[in-house]
Amino acid sequence: MLPKCRAGIGNITIIDGDTINKTNINRQLIALHSTLNQPKVNILAQRLQDINPELILDAQYQFIEKEEIDKIIKNNRYDFVVDAIDTLSPKIALITACLKNKTKIISSMGAGGRIDPSKITFADISETYHCGLAKAVRKRLQTLGIK
């Protein structure tokens, strides 16, 4: 999110109901001892506004519900969506809403237990391996007729 803000993206919507905890410190830039137990969306919003005060930011401290996702995607003309949801049902709902509304999506998969950032790759979901979350996403998408 931070590089996109630095690159000059003018509008960002962030929806997250999670708070920062110790396990986030090794992999999330906003996770510090000084930010523990604070809403991730609030800390990220402060950082983004500090990088780009002109940024139009919609930061919502809530877990996104499956039922709301389609409406949010349909009612907003996003150039692309970055999915960092780690719960399967809302992740699938977001992916399918983006596909249905022809909105580009970049979806992160499992990072838990990973320690070598040089092994991060970008691939179509059909080309992923050694990731339980990606496997579950693939399987669920296949049951919906999405390849």
Where are the model-predicted features located?
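Adenine nucleotide-associated cytosolic modules
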Residues: 1-147
